[in-house]
């Protein structure tokens, strides 16, 4: 579990480091941090990515998620962006229901409605044009994040390969925007290196180790440390904070996600017990 805790803490630095790059376009930030992370995975991971349909789909979802999240941070608060991304378990419920053509259970529907209440409060908190765009991008990051989990959960998936593909796609998406860079000194290079090495590259290596040593439920809950710490770092060092409705919505969504994770664990345990009794 220590690997996952370290991963979540390192992930949580993303919002702060992005805010330290006010003069760079979000697409530029994401593209350049991703190419650094790609090099880290390749050098330390020591292998080329595998390719199949599932890995490509997961990789595309990963690249889109990273892009939406970074650009969202340019338009809304880090708290809003990160909590929208972490609606992934809730959104995954919808994706699963559509793919299996089965309605969610009543308890799942109640969890879903609770999460939507939190999301509405976040939108209501900062409804200005820029913030609205940021919140929408945050939701799209959540959809992409959930899609990535969906494909990485398949038998022929390979999270290491899809991560490398996602980082490469993020770099490609940023190409049209690299020409807009006006200033690029140490004040830009250091945060970008921090994002690529300490916020993306190394944490993904720790995550790949830690996720094998614990249950998916524990991993999911520990990962929420990122959602809580991310806005804390930004508030402490930059002074950015959401409004009252945003804070209330933030905690409603976090609680809904935790309840959903624990509900999934309980459902799996019931299935395992019933199979043992057969």
Give the residues covered by each predicted segment:
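Hydrophobic/aromatic residues within transmembrane alpha-helices
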Residues: 21, 29, 72, 98-100, ...
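Hydrophobic transmembrane alpha-helices of multi-pass small-molecule transport proteins
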Residues: 41, 62, 94-95, 104-124, ...
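C-terminal transmembrane-helix exit sites in multi-pass transporters
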Residues: 40-46, 88-110, 228-247
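Helix-helix packing/entry segments at the starts of transmembrane helices
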Residues: 32, 81-87, 152-169, 200-236
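C-terminal-most transmembrane helix of multi-pass membrane proteins
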Residues: 32-34, 124, 224-278
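Membrane-interface helix-cap regions at the ends of transmembrane helices
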Residues: 13-16, 36-51, 67, 115-130, ...
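Transmembrane alpha-helical segments that form core, pore/gating elements
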Residues: 8, 37-41, 92-93, 127-182, ...
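Specific transmembrane alpha-helical segments of multi-pass solute transporters/efflux pumps
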Residues: 13, 45-80, 84-85, 117-121, ...
């Amino acid at each position: 579990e220590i690997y996952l805790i370290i991963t979540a803490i390192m992930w949580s630095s993303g919002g702060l480091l992005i805010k330290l790059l006010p003069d760079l376009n979000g697409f530029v930030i994401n593209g350049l941090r991703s190419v650094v992370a790609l090099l880290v995975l390749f050098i330390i991971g020591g292998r080329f990515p595998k390719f199949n349909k599932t890995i490509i789909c997961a990789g595309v979802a990963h690249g889109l998620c990273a892009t939406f999240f970074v650009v969202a941070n340019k338009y809304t608060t880090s708290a809003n962006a990160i909590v929208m991304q972490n609606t992934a378990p809730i959104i995954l419920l919808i994706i699963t229901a559509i793919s299996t053509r089965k309605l969610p259970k009543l308890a799942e529907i109640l969890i879903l409605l609770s999460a939507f209440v939190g999301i509405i409060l976040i939108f209501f908190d900062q409804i200005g044009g820029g913030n609205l765009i940021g919140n929408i991008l945050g939701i799209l990051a959540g959809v992409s994040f959930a899609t990535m989990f969906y494909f990485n959960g398949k038998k022929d998936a390979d999270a290491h390969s899809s991560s490398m593909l996602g980082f490469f796609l993020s770099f490609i998406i940023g190409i049209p925007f690299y020409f807009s860079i006006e200033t690029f000194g140490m004040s830009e290079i250091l945060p970008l290196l921090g994002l690529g090495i300490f916020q993306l590259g190394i944490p993904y290596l720790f995550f790949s180790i830690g996720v094998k040593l614990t249950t998916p439920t524990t991993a999911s809950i520990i990962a929420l440390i990122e959602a809580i710490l991310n806005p804390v770092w930004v508030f402490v060092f930059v002074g950015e904070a959401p409004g009252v409705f945003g804070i209330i919505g933030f905690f409603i969504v976090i609680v809904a996600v935790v309840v959903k994770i624990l509900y999934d664990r309980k459902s799996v345990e019931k299935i395992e017990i019933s199979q043992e009794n057969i």
